[in-house]
UniProtKB/Swiss-Prot annotation:
Gene: NINJ2
Cellular-component GO terms for this entry: plasma membrane
Phylogenetic classification of the source organism: Eukaryota, Metazoa, Chordata, Craniata, Vertebrata
Name recorded for this polypeptide: Ninjurin-2
Tissue: Widely expressed. In adult, higher expression in the bone marrow and peripheral blood lymphocytes, medium in the lung, lymph node, thyroid, uterus, thymus, spleen, prostate and skeletal muscle, lower in the liver, placenta, brain, heart and kidney. In embryo, higher expression in the thymus, heart and liver, lower in the spleen, lung, brain and kidney.
Species: Homo sapiens
Induction: By nerve injury; in Schwann cells.
Compartments where found: Cell membrane
Bias-annotated ranges (Polar residues): 12-21
Membrane topology, record value: Multi-pass membrane protein
Amino acid sequence: MESARENIDLQPGSSDPRSQPINLNHYATKKSVAESMLDVALFMSNAMRLKAVLEQGPSSHYYTTLVTLISLSLLLQVVIGVLLVVIARLNLNEVEKQWRLNQLNNAATILVFFTVVINVFITAFGAHKTGFLAARASRNPL
């Protein structure tokens, strides 16, 4: 026997909001907005890291490496943002543009991958001693 829950009426006139079909354009828009917020957060984080590294000055251990990696990450994020705007402006429903959209989407995905890898290295090179070990090292310098 099927329960009433399994027989959901997907007609647009249905009064139950749970039984309404999903508007895929609305879903994609909400997903894009959420991803954009994460992109902005990463951009702000990298800008703050760059500021901190520049304030420490060239005497810090990985100064040149961190400035280079953070700058490259920021540049890639700007390029990805421009690429995503171009992708959003092209109409997916036009068959002659679908191949180009697919290529642009692949390029954006590859650039995002490189950005993630670069940010892993930024985190690795930017790690500082914290907590117990940092307090012990400051009391007993080698």
